[in-house]
Amino acid sequence: VHDRAASTFQISSAQACVRQVQRLLQRIERRFAMRQIELDVGGEIVPFYRVADPDKVLDDVAREADLRQRLDGRRCADEPVHLPYWAEFWESGAALVAALAEGSIVENAPGLSVLDLGCGMGTAGAGAIVLGHRVMLADVVADALLFAQLNGVLAAKHTGQAPTARTRRVNWCTDCLSERFDLILGADVLYDKTQWAALERFWLAHLAPGGVVLLAEPGRQSGDVFIDWLSGRPWSLQIDKQRIPGREQPIRLLRLKTA
């Protein structure tokens, strides 16, 4: 009886996953051209959907902002335009996945509570789901969360988990969540130094005791300046490099723990 019940759950769970994937694909296809690629999670190959033409998304956002400005006469300062950086498949996200799978930077004990902050299409978060962690995918842009939810569901399906993916619209400058996390991930979130103080406040407010912030960035000058900025602040910093296929230069990893 127990085996039959488990089998029934697996079938119904798989069917629910297929339906959810179909619904999300239909919603996304109404607005975006997309293509499926493969996400390598420590040798596990998982389907992953990304925007087919990120430049077109950028053009569309700029055109909509220009239209609003012409209609209103001005653009309201309290309604900032969020440039669609989320629509790019950033290699830093793949580097976080590789680092998590290898377990060399953060111990890969399944079941960690993980926040993929500024998740974009959900690369790092999807990888963490495949590795057995409890993941929230968070971004300020609603369109990004459609892709993140789809990719999170596909990652959960790959592991046989329930066909759900926790997504949350989060502005790290203003929002406060009701939970803390063992691990906060950030791929290419250091490009704007005016955001660093807000990011730090958010990390400190949402890290569980002993928790880790793991950041990935491709070695930009902004990353160098950020490392200098951290000096004298309440963090211990470990710097590592992560190689990924198809990229000559490694991605820089920054592992932060409260000092």
Predicted regions and their residues:
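S-adenosylmethionine-dependent methyltransferases
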Residues: 2-259
